[in-house]
Amino acid sequence: MQKGIYYSFLPGEKPEDKFSWARTLGFDCVEIPTLRTQEEREYFKLAAENTGVRIPSIMNSDHWGAPFSAPEPEVRAKGMACLQQSLDTALAVGADTVLIVPAVVTPQVRFEDAWTRSQAELKTIVPEFEKNKIYMAIEDVGNKILLSPPEMARYIDDFASPYVAAYFDVGNVIPYGYPEHWILTLGSRIKKMHIKGYSAKTRTSTPDLLSGTIDWPAVMKAIRDVGYDDVLTAELRGVGNTAYDCCKSISEDMDKILEM
């Protein structure tokens, strides 16, 4: 397995600086956000190549502000336009996965409507993902939908496409489940993984990976049992007074976890 981290947590301002620090700190991969222009995408691609960093995935940028489940067609259209930009970013930089939050339940949007509207929208772009062999990966997150492993598996399977998959976040499920259970149920559907720290006792994220209540040995056993061998991408601040110190602490924690 490779070690990854999300772009914004790294020290530096320019892509080449952040990617260089990633390598110095022991990370193989860096996940990046949606890039809006082809010029920017080419810039990131060159910076990654020059520093030896792999960009495995794109975090879609507008799925909270413009959810695919919104009742307003113009909001859904904005979300879909951003998803197309995310796909274009993946193609330009060589990533094979786009992370999305598929739907958001709100006081105005019921569970059933969020499910059906989001699937109807996303099914229109699935052929583009299939044609380009890019995974559209559904993340488990606090969106009040897909709150159990079978539910998430069914949502993914409804697309009947090998390129609609799971982007599993180990920390996000702690308030309502056990990540090792989710991993075993989702199995080969998982194409990418986020890791972060979380304490079930305080119901809050932790700044480091190891001080919370996640059973990392059980998680790592489940990961190996389902045959996952891609990147683990850290999505947390880390511990320290500078971005360098924080990322160094994350990298060291990840080394310990990978040995479990």
Show where each model-derived region lies.
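Active-site acidic/histidine proton-transfer and metal-coordination neighborhood
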Residues: 50, 69-165, 175
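Acidic-and-aromatic substrate-binding clefts and catalytic sites of carbohydrate-active enzymes
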Residues: 8-15, 31-43, 67-68, 106-109, ...
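N-terminal pre-domain/capping segments
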Residues: 1-91, 161, 188, 200, ...
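Hydrophobic faces of well-ordered beta-strands that scaffold small-molecule active sites
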Residues: 2-7, 30-32, 55-60, 98-100, ...
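H/E-rich (His + Asp/Glu) clusters that bind or coordinate divalent metals
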Residues: 214-219, 226, 231-232
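Generic structural signal for well-ordered alpha-helices
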Residues: 19, 41-45, 83-88, 119-126, ...
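Acidic/histidine-rich catalytic cores of soluble enzymes
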Residues: 13, 23, 58, 123-213, ...
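Residue-level preference for long, well-ordered alpha-helices that form the structural scaffold
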Residues: 72-79, 111-114, 118, 182, ...
